[in-house]
Amino acid sequence: MQSNQVNLNLLLRRNWQKIEALQINLRHLNSVRFHMKESFGHRMAKCMLCHLLWQKGHFFVTEHPINGSVCDVLDLNTFIVYEVEAEATPSRIKRKLDDYRHPLIEDLIIIDLRKMGLSWEPLLDVRDAIDKASGLRFTEREA
């Protein structure tokens, strides 16, 4: 835990001007936040991406506004925006590139779920088991 605090202090010292200029609320640091219209697959991919960043010792924010658009994940160590897309069409990719063009953003990485050919069924089974054990009783099975 202490090394994580040291890493955070270094991050803040090195990147404070960028963090301040982008109006990043550190209250939501390393917290995964969702947009209400995101699909189950989108939310799971975002969670996994954030987990991978966290494992690498990176700090991130989610659902952060940049140029009037809201990005899925912003890595505060690299200032790379990650966007999870169900269908990354050429026009959609161009729009994302335009949306997140900002002098403080280093890059944009689009994770196209369609190209990955993933099946969320195993995770849905885990969700259903947790649902049953917790008593939450979700009735729909969304994919």
Question: Model-found features: residue ranges?
Answer:
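Short coil/turn segments at the loop-to-beta-strand junctions that recur within blades
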Residues: N67-G68, P90
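Catalytic cores of nucleic-acid endonucleases
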Residues: C47, A86-E142
